[in-house]
Design a protein with these regions (language model features):
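Acidic, Mg2+-coordinating active-site environments of NTP-dependent enzymes
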Residues: 6-163
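Conserved helix/coil segment N-terminal to the catalytic DExD/H
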Residues: 1-3
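Glycine-rich phosphate/pyrophosphate-binding beta-alpha loops
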Residues: 151, 166-176
Length: 176
């Protein structure tokens, strides 16, 4: 589907059963994802270290490609979350990056949303000159203001004891 597209930056978020209707097997799906990270012209790769398939993707990346990693659990990543807390209002985490650290308080729900935000922060960091503390503070402020899209981990009811969310995820991995 993307043969004619030249990518500058590629992000590996995960490898799940989500698109097995399109791919014949997990192995075939993984191999197709790896093609993105070996494509001509790629200059940056952003990799989720929390996914078991991450090492396979990392091993496929050419040495000329600048690589950044992110994680909600692993402090060895280039960008990672410290003291991550999920709440009934969303989440709070301290994000550590090569250009500094900052706190994000988001209105998004679920670990997958925090992980996706770390991917976005990683892309931003990859394009910045090093040691620009103000930029990470501004980025954390912007990220904290994001809201979920309609129908995806969206609050539809809230009382003092129960928060009701609607999510149209169609696979078990989409509900994590």
């Amino acid at each position: 589907r993307v043969k004619a597209v030249k990518f500058d930056t590629a992000i590996f978020t995960n490898l799940t059963r989500d698109h097995l209707d399109y791919h014949e097997s997990m192995e075939a799906y993984g191999n197709n994802k790896k093609k993105l990270f070996t494509s001509e012209g790629l200059s940056r790769a952003i990799i989720n270290l929390d996914d078991p398939y991450a090492l396979s993707v990392i091993n496929a990346i050419a040495p000329s490609v600048e690589m950044y990693t992110y994680s909600i659990k692993n402090s060895a990543a280039t960008v990672y979350a410290e003291s991550l807390t999920l709440t009934r209002q969303g989440f709070e985490a301290r994000v550590v990056t090569p250009i500094g650290a900052g706190v994000i308080k988001g209105k998004l729900f679920g670990y997958f949303n925090v992980s996706n935000l770390l991917a976005v922060i990683s892309v931003f960091v990859s394009y910045l000159p090093k040691k620009k503390e103000l930029d990470i503070e501004q980025l954390c402020e912007l990220v904290s203001g994001l809201s979920p899209v309609d129908g995806r981990m969206q609050i539809v009811g809230d009382t003092s004891e129960i928060t009701a969310l609607v999510d149209y995820a169609h696979t078990p991995d989409g509900l994590r």
